[in-house]
Amino acid sequence: MNDKDLEIEYLKKIDLFQRHNKHYYDKNKPIVSDQEFDLLKKDIIDLERKYKFLKSEYSPTKSIGFKPSKNFQKIKHKVPMLSLGNAFNEEDLKNFEKKIINFLSLKDVNTIEYSAEPKIDGISASLIYIDGKLTKGLSRGDGNEGEDITQNLKTIKDIPLEITKSNFPKEIDIRGEVFIENNDFKKIKDKFANPRNAASGSLRQKNSLITAKIPLKFIAYTYGYEKKMNIKNQTSFLENLKLWGFKTNPFNKKIIGVKNLMLNHKELEEKRKELAFDIDGIVYKVNDFDLQKRLGFAANAPRWAIAHKFSANSSISEIMNIEIQIGRTGALTPVAKIKPVNIGGVIVSNATLHNEDEIVRKDIRVGDTVTVERAGDVIPHVVSVDLKKRKQNSKKFIFPLKCPSCGSKTIKDYNETTKRQDAVRRCASEGFECEKIAIERIKHFVSKDAFNIDGFGKKIVENFWNLKLVRLPQDIFKLNYNKIEELEGWGKLSVANLRFSIEEKKNISLERFIYSLGIRHIGQENAKLIARHLKTASNFFRLSGEKNIESLSNIDGIGITQIQSIKKFFLNKTNLKVLSELEKNLLIKDVILINNNGLLKNKTFMLTGKLNGISRAEAKSLIEQNSGKIISNVNKKLDYLIAGDKPTLKKINTAKEWNIKIINQTEWLKMLNKSG
């Protein structure tokens, strides 16, 4: 084996080690036995000793040397710690601002002020203060619940333990980033892979004395909830944070206009290497807190903030092979297996090619020399092909016309919206009859946003599938734990933990349950809309009739595409069998509206025409916040038709025929105790 082949073999082992390391240390969910993990480390160390030119900062000789505790108590965040949407260019920012303008129905774009704050590449934390005292400190966790790491956070000098300022809120959840400055990291780099890993590992130590030895810093930047805080905007809040004893980012700015946001982004990107800490972009927040409240949240991110990432990292590599991956909805995704390369501190050996059309457009072939790009959390992808280096015997890649998993034909759906064929080719099966789809649907079923079964990750799903322990979702709730206990890497304690995690998740909300089924076009937001409409699990299980499914078209946001997908789902006999079994094994909670005593409780509304000073999206949001219900068709279930300027006459006439009350904007706002 020559030096180049040795290096490739070594980097593959490093890549595998990093993936296992993440599950072992960061997630506390090992996917291989301790023996296999130790053997892999030994292989890498032996290679380094024998061949001195083999080096990597991700080697086990340089990475974290202790295992964090599994004993941190999990606590639910009062207000979820949501992730942000990403922007990568000026067009993305323009779209972000356009959505804000449309939602708020603003006429002057220059009225929107932004707080621009550098995005530190660290670990998010939540600090709960009651009567000025730090009572609890939580990690972000999965966004809905975090771990109680109070004692470790108290070791950070930047975090005040008690605040006596008169204007400090009676109760507040201060949020910020824990990180290590680059110069401090140089002193401890032999123990950790990178500054972020150092911060993460240190915060999850059972012994806070170990955490205290690490030079952690904390910068505050927002709040989750508060009581009795009289502050009107984000920039004033940041100023008050400093008065209360917190450190804030010295590069925070107040900016108006996308062009100025872009100038600030360019300026900071040029300076980033000179900064004391790592940043990977800038977060823009609508400055005015009242506007933030009006904008609210989408499914899993605020509408009033976005993270503008810095330029992607890229590297040159060679495509060794092109493989087809099959997703839970049957989508066939081509993936380039490339020679492992380091891109922005991460070893990359796979890059997505997106779809068949993309391969044809770029004429991507096995053996090609390509530029691979990785930006933030985005999956690495092939940007371009160096045609000058193309091998003479290269052949065009032929996309499979049959599913590589089950042999069914592959199809491209006709898109009713674009009036064109989809770019994505799919397995015609789309059900549990296709092995790869079945595995991916089960992975989706147990995923974070669905059942969120702790310790039941993707590798466990694959292992249990190969052992024929799981074939359908209901099998998860009927596992043979005695058999699992005999498997390599499992023992009484790990099996008991898995059993507890599964039993704990038998109680689930209706929206999570609907989302877990992996119905095409039914994401989190649509699952929530359907759950709110149906209210009970029994109503969902009774959807199998075509007429019942058609009734979902009354939900604002559910269209023909979603209705067709739901019909297709309920026509599949295996899906019906899965639903029947899950109904027996689960306790699915009815939907209880947060504001169940709202001013519009049990009332249904429909909008027609243009409203004055408020967008249709915000009007719908206000109705739902006050326990009202939006429907999209005029029918006998409609209580009020809200008519703005230039309403649709057909809707007005139909409402009159059925004696439905027609009200104007002023009358509707009075119902909300608001002045028009």
Curated annotation (Swiss-Prot):
* UniProt keyword annotation of Iron present: no
Q: Which domain of life is it from?
A: Bacteria
Q: Which cofactor does it need?
A: Mg(2+); Mn(2+)
Q: Which PROSITE patterns match?
A: BRCT, DNA_LIGASE_N1
Keyword terms of this UniProt record: DNA damage, DNA repair, DNA replication, Ligase, Magnesium, Manganese, Metal-binding, NAD, Zinc
Positions contributing to Zn(2+) binding: 403, 406, 427, 434
Q: What is its EC number?
A: 6.5.1.2
Binding positions for NAD(+) per the UniProt entry: 34-38, 83-84, 117, 140, 177, 285, 309
- UniProt cross-references to PANTHER family, sorted A to Z: CHROMOSOME TRANSMISSION FIDELITY FACTOR 18, DNA LIGASE
Q: What does this protein do?
A: DNA ligase that catalyzes the formation of phosphodiester linkages between 5'-phosphoryl and 3'-hydroxyl groups in double-stranded DNA using NAD as a coenzyme and as the energy source for the reaction. It is essential for DNA replication and repair of damaged DNA.
Give the protein family: Belongs to the NAD-dependent DNA ligase family. LigA subfamily.
The record's section on HAMAP family has: DNA_ligase_A
Its protein name is: DNA ligase
Name the species this protein comes from: Pelagibacter ubique (strain HTCC1062)
